[in-house]
């Protein structure tokens, strides 16, 4: 996605309100080797990168969006490095011990990148539902789902483990107008839009005086764990 100041502000509000990224990091943590150098591929503004740091030696956060990386650099903590560029070309000097692809990339692409850049496990976090949640109409997520990932891995004969879980990632709003801007920003329908009344019907009372509205979103996710050694060179082409 193309990051904007507004989309970044929305996500930072949601991340501060919920333990979404912490929950994902906690699921990955037990499977990380000791003192690991972990890559958060397609990190966005780096909320997951920061959440992963307590569980490893170093996190390298990579994203192609300059504004997203600029935002992360403004909130960096010790042990996290932010790099701006294409994952395909920003290979590390030494292979990563682990790589995380959270809601990022086609499965085939992530396998190819991981084979070249990682010597250990890779973690794919995928949506465990089939349609976009913030659109006016029914918009398919296509191949960016857990079901699609499982089909690809089965077809390629790559062994994996999978863990299904949920994490609350609702969106707080300071006003109804902010909620309208959010739905306009994330609506993937080509012709349909939500009215103010339809938007209001999706909202609940906000958690504080600052945030008077809240959009609940218990996100169903799948965590796929794959050993890089199980990916053949032919499959990584």
Feature locations, PLM:
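A short SAM/SAH-binding and catalytic strip from SAM-dependent methyltransferases
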Residues: 97-111
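Class I SAM-dependent methyltransferase SAM/SAH-binding core
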Residues: 45-86
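Conserved beta-strand signature within the Rossmann-like core of class I S-adenosyl-L-methionine
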Residues: 119-132
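Conserved class I S-adenosyl-L-methionine
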Residues: 35-44
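Conserved Class I S-adenosyl-L-methionine
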Residues: 164-237
């Amino acid at each position: 996605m193309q990051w904007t100041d507004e989309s970044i502000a929305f996500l930072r509000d949601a991340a501060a309100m919920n333990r979404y990224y912490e929950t994902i990091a906690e699921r990955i943590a037990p499977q990380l080797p000791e003192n690991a150098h972990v890559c958060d591929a397609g990190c966005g503004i780096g909320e997951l990168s920061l959440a992963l740091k307590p569980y490893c030696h170093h996190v390298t956060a990579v994203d192609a969006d300059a504004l997203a990386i600029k935002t992360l650099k403004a909130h960096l903590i010790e042990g996290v490095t932010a790099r701006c560029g294409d994952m395909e070309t920003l290979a590390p000097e030494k292979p990563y011990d682990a790589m995380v692809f959270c809601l990022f990339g086609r499965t085939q692409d992530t396998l190819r990148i991981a084979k070249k850049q990682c010597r250990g496990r890779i973690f794919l976090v995928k949506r465990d539902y089939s349609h976009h949640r913030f659109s006016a109409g029914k918009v398919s997520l296509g191949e960016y789902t857990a079901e699609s990932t499982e089909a690809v891995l089965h077809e390629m004969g790559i062994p994996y483990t999978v863990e299904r879980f949920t994490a609350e990632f609702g969106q707080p709003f300071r006003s109804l107008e902010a909620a309208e801007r959010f739905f306009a920003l994330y609506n993937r329908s080509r012709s349909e839009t939500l009215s103010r009344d339809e938007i209001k019907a999706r909202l609940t009372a906000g958690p504080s005086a600052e945030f008077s509205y809240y959009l609940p979103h218990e996100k169903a996710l799948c965590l796929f764990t794959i050993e890089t050694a199980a990916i053949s060179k032919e499959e990584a082409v």
